[in-house]
Amino acid sequence: MMTETMPIHTGAGASPVRRLVMFWTTAGALAAIAVLPYAIALNPALLERVGMPIPLLVFAQFAKAFVQLALLSWAGLRLGHAIGLGSPLAQALAYRKPAFSLPGTTLALAAVAGAVMGALLPMLDRLFLPFMPGAAPSAPTAIDLWKRVLASFYGGITEELICRLFLMTLIVWICWKFASHKGAPPRAWMIWSGIVGASLVFGIGHLPAASGVWPLTAAVIARTLVLNGLGGIAFGWLYWRRGLEHAVLAHFAADIVVHVIGGS
């Protein structure tokens, strides 16, 4: 079932969609700076490499993320409106929908599903270890708990805005635009093309980091795509069936398990 959408106005009365864009853009940009303490703890040379004081780095990170996410969120919401994908909970609040009620049960299930995914991924990672080239990577750096908690917001919010709200929506919209009868909703294969396509792109985006640890053998590539793609498929399904908020919560819960409980 496609998520319920409400009209997105583009003229003078466009304040609700502007509020939606502003809400998600601000949340994503704040998450982009929240990950900085974790990133610096993981790679202390980062500060030396960027060559700027921390306050300036925070401002630059926020400004860059804000501009990028504003464009991506606006595009994702606009395209998603045509195909039944979007952010129904935030949209209902923006429109002050009188009959709105928070779907606590499905949100809780999304959080549980994300936590289960976060617990399964390290187990799946162990299956790849016998096939990985060279020595195993060194033990992870001990990072303060609060830094790991903050880092989880980046995955839950910023990555979902990029991968689900924008990228998955764009892929589905392209398939729908060129392969569907006018006025017909997207078919299942179009939705799944978006889910899998966005997950693959997300996994491919992690290959440069993997290449810093191992040579890019078939096993390394498979591990990178599988571990990063499986979560994306689950989050994409939630985005399709329940809306962006459910995907955000599930991704956040998965990262809490991986980073906070798992300590990675």
Describe the function of each predicted region:
Residues 9-27, 61-66, 97-112, 245:
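Alpha-helical transmembrane segments and their helix-start/interface "positive-inside/aromatic belt" motifs
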Residues 48-64, 142-152:
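Membrane-interface segments at the starts/ends of alpha-helical transmembrane spans
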Residues 86-158, 173-185:
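Juxtamembrane helix-loop-helix connectors linking adjacent transmembrane helices
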Residues 72-88, 166-173:
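Membrane-water interface of transmembrane alpha-helices
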Residues 57-70, 220-227:
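Alpha-helical transmembrane segments of polytopic membrane proteins
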Residues 1-20, 80-99:
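N-terminal juxtamembrane cytosolic/stromal segments of multi-pass membrane proteins
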Residues 26-46, 73-81, 118-126:
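Alpha-helical transmembrane segments of multi-pass membrane proteins
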